[in-house]
Amino acid sequence: MAHIEKQAGELQEKLIAVNRVSKTVKGGRIFSFTALTVVGDGNGRVGFGYGKAREVPAAIQKAMEKARRNMINVALNNGTLQHPVKGVHTGSRVFMQPASEGTGIIAGGAMRAVLEVAGVHNVLAKAYGSTNPINVVRATIDGLENMNSPEMVAAKRGKSVEEILGK
C-alpha cells in the first residue's frame, strides 16, 4: 500500500495511492493516472502532493514535487502530539490524540503514512466519514496544522508557559 524511500535530502517519501482514471471521447477512452504522495523529514515537517499524468511514473514524480513544495511545520512533543486535535476536509473527519511512549502509531491507511513521515511515533487516531485517501490526508494535515504548542498558546495569550501548563 504505502511505499517508502529515502532521498539525499533526508526526506521520507511515501506513495499512498495510484489510481487509473479515464476520459471518454468520441474515439474511445483515454486513460490517465493519479498519484497521492506524502513527504516528510521525520522531525515535524510534512507535505502532500497529488499528481496527474498519462503514465504512472510521471504522475508519481509530479505528486512528489508538489509535496515538497507544500510542506508545513508541525510542533511535536517527544514524538507525539501536543494535545488532542480534530481535522476536517469535505466528508472526512479525523481525530488524533497523544499517546504514551511505546504505543506506536494506531491509525489506518493514509493517516498512518502522514503521521509516519511527520515524525510522530506514538498516537491514537481515527478517521470518520469518508475514507477517500485524498480527503483523509487533507483532514490529517488540517488537524496537524491546527495543533498549538504551549509556547504558541502562551505567546498568543501573553502569559508564561508555566501558567499555560498549570505548573
UniProtKB/Swiss-Prot annotation:
N-acetylalanine modifications at: A2
Any one GO molecular-function label of the UniProt entry: rRNA binding
Keywords of the record: Acetylation, Antibiotic resistance, Ribonucleoprotein, Ribosomal protein, RNA-binding, rRNA-binding
GO CC field: cytoplasm; cytosol; cytosolic small ribosomal subunit
Domain S5 DRBM: residue ranges: 11-74
Result of altering V21E: In strain: SPCR7; spectinomycin resistant. Not a ram mutation
GO-annotated biological processes: cytoplasmic translation; maintenance of translational fidelity; response to antibiotic; ribosomal small subunit assembly; translation
InterPro entries: Ribosomal_Su5_D2-typ_SF, Ribosomal_uS5, Ribosomal_uS5_bac-type, Ribosomal_uS5_C, Ribosomal_uS5_N, Ribosomal_uS5_N_CS, Ribsml_uS5_D2-typ_fold_subgr
Family (UniProt): Belongs to the universal ribosomal protein uS5 family.
Quaternary context: Part of the 30S ribosomal subunit. Contacts proteins uS4 and uS8. With proteins uS4 and uS5 encircles the mRNA as it enters the ribosome, which may play a role in mRNA helicase processivity. Can be cross-linked to mRNA. In collided ribosomes contacts ribosome rescue factor SmrB.
NCBIfam families listed in its UniProt record: rpsE_bact
Record's comment describing the protein's domains: The N-terminal domain interacts with the head of the 30S subunit; the C-terminal domain interacts with the body and contacts protein uS4. The interaction surface between uS4 and uS5 is involved in control of translational fidelity.
Further facts: Altered uS5 proteins have been identified in a number of mutants. Some mutations in uS5 have been shown to increase translational error frequencies. Some mutants in this protein can partially suppress an alanyl-tRNA synthetase mutant.
Protein role: With uS4 and uS12 plays an important role in translational accuracy. Many suppressors of streptomycin-dependent mutants of protein uS12 are found in this protein, some but not all of which decrease translational accuracy (ram, ribosomal ambiguity mutations).
PANTHER family assigned to the protein according to its UniProt record, in alphabetical order: MITOCHONDRIAL RIBOSOMAL PROTEIN S5
Protein's UniProt name: Small ribosomal subunit protein uS5
UniProt organism field: Escherichia coli (strain K12)
Gene: rpsE
